[in-house]
Amino acid sequence: MTKSSFHKLLLGSVLMLLPFTVQAQVVLKNWTIEDHSGKVKILVSSDTLEITAPDGLTLWYNQRLTGDYEIGYRVKMLMQGGKYDRLSDLNCFWGANDPEYPDNLFARSEWRNGIFQRYKTLSLFYVGYGGNHNSTTRFRQYFAKAADTSDAIARPVIKEYTDKAHLLIPNKWYDIKIRVEKESQLTVSTAKSCSDCRLKRMRETDISDSAYWKTTHYLQAFR
């Protein structure tokens, strides 16, 4: 067996053993980067992405997710005295669509470019974990309005927490699960304390009129 074929075999074995979402982390071509600073650094180590972002960054998983699905990942907010270390905004978008380009979420990718206000132009669901300098955790729905639309109209808060139990702890691994079930409910929780960290339960009838169920779903990790 040649060295080249061994590497190909090894890679294939690793990818088969890893969960679907972890496979995507290994292959950067499955991610679309919207980086306001132009200086983001992403290091790949085994099944982990280490991200250093000087300014606004949106990292989209660019494969389509449809039907019922669960998004799961582990994440840590590193606080080690680095220049860009900041304990705030462990955020996630999902169920995202652009009504201006319903068949291509990334048509305005260069325009959005990690600038947070511009994501108001999308329809999606959002969790801002430890937002506002780690003082709030909020679950919102976005309604695809103009970027300068007030938050109350463009992205109203569905549920908010301000207690310490729902805020970020530095250098802690979080097991995040987001489950979407069209026929039953939508939940957002941390795996280790699901009952405490659930943000919202919504029956299908509450959101069936939105573009969420009618078009393609995407996963986004925002930091």
Positions of predicted regions on the chain:
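Short carbohydrate-recognition loop motifs
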Residues: V40-L57
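Boundary at the C-terminal end of the N-terminal hydrophobic targeting segment
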Residues: V22-A24
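Beta-strand-rich interaction surfaces with strong enrichment in secreted/lumenal proteins
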Residues: L57-R64, T162-L167, S208-D209
